[in-house]
């Protein structure tokens, strides 16, 4: 479709971190942004181009267009365990509740559970996810069928999967079209043998892929890794050659000095998941330290079983608020920096450089924020309003790849929400 937005406020998220809000128009031709400006230069900019016939012209008065949020760590299909096994420490939660239920999942379950998660993403202004779960091709297919953009990775561990299967999934998902891609990864050091980790490292070398894993989520995880190997998870995975082509870690709460050095030297990304870390009492990530070291930071929700809400507004607020508490410094990690993490930095760690900001030639992955709501007024500082007082209620529209998938409470993903809800409830009822 060809869509023209006019009378809009536009936050492009410039590369140099200049957080300017312009006023004017944004044009989408097919799946690509083809014009951003105040309209006065259209004749010059578009000289020689064919006349665009608009499928829709949207008056965006009172709204802000901005890049969609990039959920840089999640387990989407864990929607079936939302509010099922709560108020437990991480290891008990995993071994006594999560793993036994996950053993009963089949591929068709994954498909419908994933669609449920995608619906929630869209209401939160999330336009892509970095998803780790079983049956990555099935997850990817659910995303494609909804029109959603996904980056899949592997949850390979000692209890399921193989390096051969990881390679097959890597090749298959990366051949499924422009909405799906795959980055090599595995679950965590504490669930994965050295032999498997060596296989992952070899595969990353073969395909020049980054590697991502759960890393330093809890103090116990780090202690036990040091007991086994005499080094932290970051140091071990680096020693195994994981990061020749970059990558990073999810959580990164309990980091040591050498870990920061490795992240900086290898150009790795730390993905913080504050709500999950609070709920599981894992700790508060050293966000300010990462920023001070020049280490890239992105934000994820983690899964709906450990969060339990797939809401980037909550994650952004917690990222900055917890950093202020941890450092006893109300000035650290400003709202603008957090907004950059949730959009541009997330896209880059996911390999989505073609939709990391709003610019001509970039993919049209964008959202429209309704500023005419009590929590967004007055407009003293719109960016700070988004982070400190914004919520899902302000997401008026979510567009992925030029297609409006969610608009003011209505989904256009090709599925009846009631059918999706019924399928998800049937999965968990079967397991009780």
Describe each region flagged by the PLM:
Residues 8, 26, 31, 62, ...:
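Divalent metal-coordination and catalytic microenvironments
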Residues 138-258:
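Metal-coordinating catalytic core of metallo-dependent amide/deamination hydrolases
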Residues 82-147, 168-176, 423-430:
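Alpha-helical scaffold segments that flank or form the walls of functional sites
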Residues 80-112, 146-154, 174, 219-246, ...:
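Active-site gating loops and adjacent loop-to-helix segments of metal-dependent hydrolytic enzymes
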Residues 1-24, 28-34, 342-432:
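Active-site microenvironment of metallo-dependent hydrolases
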Residues 163, 219-231, 259-263, 281-290, ...:
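Histidine/acidic-residue-rich catalytic or RNA/ligand-binding cores of hydrolases
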Residues 239-246, 288-371, 389-390:
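His/Asp/Glu-enriched, well-ordered alpha-helical/loop segment
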């Amino acid at each position: 479709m060809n869509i023209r937005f006019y009378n809009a406020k536009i936050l492009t998220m410039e590369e140099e971190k200049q957080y300017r809000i312009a006023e004017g128009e944004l044009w989408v031709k097919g799946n690509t942004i083809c014009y951003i400006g105040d309209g006065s230069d259209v004749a010059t900019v578009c000289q020689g181009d064919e006349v665009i016939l608009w499928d829709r012209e949207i008056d965006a008065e009172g709204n802000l267009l901005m890049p969609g949020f990039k959920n840089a760590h999640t387990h989407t299909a864990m929607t079936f365990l939302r509010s099922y096994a709560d108020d437990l420490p991480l290891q008990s939660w995993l071994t006594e509740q999560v793993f036994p239920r996950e053993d009963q999942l089949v591929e068709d379950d994954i498909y419908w559970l994933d669609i449920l998660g995608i619906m929630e993403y869209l209401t939160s202004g999330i336009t892509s996810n970095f998803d780790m779960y079983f049956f990555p091709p099935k997850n990817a297919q659910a995303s494609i069928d909804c029109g959603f953009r996904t980056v899949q990775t592997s949850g390979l561990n000692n209890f399921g999967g193989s390096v051969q299967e990881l390679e097959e999934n890597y090749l298959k998902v990366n051949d499924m079209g422009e909405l799906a891609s795959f980055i090599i990864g595995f679950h965590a050091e504490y669930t994965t043998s050295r032999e498997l980790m060596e296989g992952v490292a070899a595969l990353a070398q073969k395909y020049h892929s980054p590697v991502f894993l759960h890393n330093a989520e809890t103090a116990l995880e780090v202690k036990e890794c040091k007991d086994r190997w005499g080094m932290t998870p970051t140091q071990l995975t680096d020693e195994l050659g994981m990061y020749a082509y970059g990558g990073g870690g999810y959580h990164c709460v309990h980091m040591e000095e050498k870990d920061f050095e490795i992240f900086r030297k290898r150009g790795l990304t730390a993905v913080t998941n504050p709500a999950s870390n609070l709920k599981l009492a894992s700790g508060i990530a050293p966000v300010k330290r990462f920023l001070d070291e020049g280490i890239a930071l992105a934000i994820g929700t983690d899964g709906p079983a450990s969060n339990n809400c797939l809401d980037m507004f909550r994650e952004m607020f917690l990222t900055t608020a917890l950093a202020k508490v941890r450092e006893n410094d109300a000035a650290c990690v400003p709202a603008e920096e957090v907004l950059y993490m949730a959009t541009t930095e997330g896209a880059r760690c996911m390999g989505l450089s073609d939709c990391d900001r709003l610019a001509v030639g970039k993919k049209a992955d964008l959202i429209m924020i309704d500023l005419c709501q009590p929590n967004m007024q007055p407009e003293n500082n719109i960016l700070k309003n988004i982070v400190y007082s914004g919520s899902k209620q302000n997401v008026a529209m979510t567009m992925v790849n030029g297609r409006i998938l969610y608009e003011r409470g209505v989904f256009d993903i090709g599925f009846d929400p009631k059918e999706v809800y019924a399928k998800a409830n049937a999965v968990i009822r079967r397991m009780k």
